[in-house]
Amino acid sequence: MAATSEGPLFAASIEKTWGSVVRSPEGTPQKVRELIDEGIVPEEGGTEPKDTAATFQSVDGSPQAEQSPLESTSKEAFFHRVETFSSLKWAGKPPELSPLICAKYGWVTVECDMLKCSSCQAFLCASLQPTFDFGRYKERCAELKKSLCSAHEKFCFWPDSPSPDRFGMLPLGEPAVLISEFLDRFQSLCHLDLQLPSLRPEDLKTMCLTEDAVSALLHLLEDELDFHADDRKTTSKLGSDVQVQATACVLSLCGWACSSLEPTQLSLITCYQCMRKVGLWGFQQIESSMTDLEASFGLTSSPIPGVEGRPEHFPLVPESPRRMMTRSQDATVSPGSEQSEKSPGPIVSRTRSWESSSPVDRPELEAASPTTRSRPVTRSMGTGDSAGVEVPSSPLRRTKRARLCSSSSSDTSPRSFFDPTSQHRDWCPWVNITLVKETKENGETEVDACTPAEPGWKAVLTILLAHKRSNQPAETDSMSLSEKSRKVFRIFRQWESSSSS
């Protein structure tokens, strides 16, 4: 009876509050929802009513509840989700479960093989059990691909409005966008200057990058820079070194860009499709390759007469300012300290280091380094009888120090060359063929027969060269630019010969 009496009282109160507006039975449910929303909204700190989708997102506790309609259409948010798929958390997955597809439906990685929706906070375990049954493996992959849509909560918007497919593809149907992005990457890479990695001519031959192709790309970049009057000061500063231009051109063609233009930041390059970051200090750089190249072309030192008339061969390898400073500091250090920094054994402070030398060598040692007696000297790794061999003033020790300087001056020689294609992740559109095929099947781009079985960077190269040929002006500066390209490739070949020798 109490329940039946509350109904008329509630209806009467609503009618008293809203008057003739509530008398329509069609408007009553909507007004009740508005009354309920007005009681819930102040808890979120607002005073205006919100729509139903925003209410569900706030109840779910998503920190981006108000931006949920824009999250699926935001390219920046899309690649933020892609960046969470690191190699440690997401490895060994087929192409249909690539991070680009998972991020398309709002998923991020929180643990190894564990996905989480960025909106409804639902979890999805995407582990693939090792099995020798290929049929079961394909079934599990198909199940996980279907779960990318079905594993969301009931009111989540991702299954109905995922991110556009074009976010995970290269804009092959928009040459203007390709050229603009190509130019931006090129300019950012030129800021690294001599810190750019050295490229191996064998890799360029494998990529079918000929001298004419690089020359045409450099000419295209030069033409595009002429259309940007505001960037002329920057381009005049960036266009001083041909080696830097050619290397930056090849890297930007393969999708690489400088991570940060701050001078204090580390030399990092990034692919903004697979979000891979590569530190250039692990590869041979242009600066070190140029010094090795100049050394291989006859810039070696003549023998310097050493102690007792023996010649000492100190390498005269062209050095960077930092190495020149290090070499000058090494020249002022006494032989005793040189011996201490070479030996891996424990250091023992001894004030009678001159006792191990012969009486004939003692005056020469004291004249060469008066402070050697107070320097710490390393203990020899053998018995005390071999102390005479480890004398700092002996010619043998000075020759070893020369070899140490030689190895330190060419410390980048064992570093590998940078391969602009193999450094991408295997699902990256720049090196992946599948996504380029999907571009044709979906009809979003109209690329004829240029990319039926080509990686993304090669499709971009074909489009850029076609655009350059279609807009080819009269023969003005093409010959001079072609000469620049041939000069750069001669330098590439010289680097290869110097590194192999």
UniProtKB/Swiss-Prot annotation:
Its main location: nucleus. The keyword Ribonucleoprotein does not apply. The modification Phosphoserine is found at residues 24, 58, 62, 68, 320, 328, 334, 337, 343, 353, 358, 369, 380, 394, 406, 482. InterPro entries: NuBaID_C, NuBaID_N. The modification Phosphothreonine is found at residues 28, 84, 332, 383. It is found in: Nucleus; Nucleus envelope. A zinc finger (C3HC-type) spans 102-156. Transmembrane segments: none annotated. One of its GO terms (cellular component) is nucleoplasm. Residues 21-73, 302-421 are annotated as: Disordered. Residues 406-420 have a biased composition (Low complexity). Residues 54-72, 326-338, 350-359, 369-383 have a biased composition (Polar residues). Phosphorylated. May also be weakly phosphorylated on Tyr residues. GO terms for biological process: cell division; protein ubiquitination. The keyword Iron-sulfur does not apply. The modification N-acetylalanine is found at residue 2. Keywords: Acetylation, Cell cycle, Cell division, Metal-binding, Mitosis, Nucleus, Phosphoprotein, Ubl conjugation pathway, Zinc, Zinc-finger. A motif (Nuclear localization signal) lies at residues 395-401. GO terms for molecular function: protein kinase binding; zinc ion binding. Interacts with TPR; this interaction mediates ZC3HC1 nuclear envelopes (NE)-association but also required for proper positioning of a substantial amount of TPR at the nuclear basket (NB). Required for proper positioning of a substantial amount of TPR at the nuclear basket (NB) through interaction with TPR. This is Zinc finger C3HC-type protein 1. The gene is Zc3hc1.
